[in-house]
Amino acid sequence: MTSEQLFYDKKTGFDRLTDEDKQGIQTYAEGYKKFLDESKTERDAVLEIARMAESKGFRAWTRDDTLRPGDKIYRINRHKGIMLAVIGEKSLAEGVRLTAAHLDAPRVDIRTVPLYEDNGMAFFKTHYYGGIKKYQWTAIPLELRGVVCVCENGEVKRVQVRVGDKPTDPKFVITDLLPHLATEQMTRKATEVIKGEGLNILIGSVPSETVDEKCSEKIKLAITEHLNREYGMTEADFLSAELCCVPAFNACDIGFDRSFVGAYGHDDRVCSYPAATSLFDLTETPAHTGVCLLVDKEEIGSDGVTGMQSRAFDTFMADLCRAQDVLLDECFENSVCLSADVCNAFDPNYPDVSEKRNDARANCGFALVKYTGARGKSGTSDATAELMARIRCIFDKAGVIWQTGQLGKVDQGGGGTVAMYLANRNIDTVDAGVPVLSMHAPFECIAKLDLYMAYKGFGAFYRD
C-alpha cells in the first residue's frame, strides 16, 4: 500500500466534488440563507420548520393517532422546539435513526422590568443569553423579536413582536464608549470591557405630547404609548413577555468566490436546517423510522421544559412506541443518534488555541466529533469505536465528504453538546456537525461545502 492509502490526511473537499455536488452546494446554501433570515429566534425557527414540513406532506400528530410506514408527522413543544418523524418499514423495537440539534443561539434578552428613561434617552435593561463576548454586541444594529402574552377578557392572547428585520424598520443599538475617553476601559480584561449591566439598548428619545402632570418621564411615556398602540400592551405586560434583541444582519455570501456564508446563528441552525431538510427530502420510506429533534436551551445547559433534559422527547417517543405496542426502552437501546452540533473550525489567525491535527477545517466536510467536554473529557459523551466505524461506513458509502474534529487544545477551554443527554437515555450517540469560524459572535462564518455535506450525511444516516 502507498503512503496515501496508509495515512489519514484532511484534504480539501474541492478535489473530491462531483458535478452534482458543485451545483447542489450553491443551490442548497441559498435556501439556508433564507431560513436564517426568518429564524433568528427559536420561536421563529419552529414556525419556519413547521411551515416547511407541511409543504412536504408532514402533519401535526397527537397521541393515539394511528401510524403507518411512510407517515410524516411532527409535534411542537411549547412553541420553542419541534420533533419530526418519518415512520419506517421496521418496527420501532429495532430503533430509530435520530438527529438532535438546537434552535437557540446566543442573544440579548429583554428583562422583565426593562423600560427606563435616563438623561433624555429611553433604554431597555437586558440579560444576555448564552456564552457571549459582551463587547461584540455593542455598536451593531439590532432587531427586536419575540412575543408578549397579555390577558384579554380573561384569556391569554399571544402577540408577535418583530421590529428591525425590514429595510424600512428602525433598528436598536447598545452604545459603546468613544476611544478618546476609553483610557480606563481599554485597560480592563476582555470579560469586563463591557459589563453585563451595561448592555442597555437604546430605544428612543422623543417625549410624549400627552398632557399628564403626574408623569415626569415623558420619553418613557412616549415609548409605552407606542407599544400600547402597536401591541395592546402596558408596561406590566413585560412581565409575561419573551423579547430579545438579535443582530440585524441578513445572511450573505463571504469571499470573492462566495464559498462562505456569514450570518447570525449558525450555531446551531447550520445543523438544524440540514437535519430537518434531509428528512423532508427522503423520497422513499426508510427502513428505520427517521426522527429529527430540534430543541431549545442548549446554550444555557439544556434545562427547562423545552431543553434536551426535559421529558418532552421521551413523551413523544413513548407515544410513537405505544402506537406500535413497543417498549420505549427497547426502542432507545436499538437507536442511533447523530448529535448535530457545530464544532470549531481551525482559524489560522488564532492557531495557538487549536490542535491542528485534530481540529476540523473549513471546506474539509462534515465533522464527526468523538467527544467534546473539558478538563479530562468532563461533561461529554465519548462515542464508542464501534459507533464511529459504523458512521464512517455510512458516510463513505454515500459519498459524503467528512472529517473529524475536536474542541481545541487539551486544557485550553472546552464545551459541550446535547450528546450526553441522549446517550444517558441508552442511545448510541456521536456528535456530528459543521465547522464554524467566529462561533458565538453576532456574525459567524461557515463553508458552503461543509453545509452541503452535512445535508448529504444526515440523509445517508436516515436511509441506513
Describe each region flagged by the PLM.
Residues 1-464:
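N-terminal hydrophobic/helix-forming segments and targeting peptides
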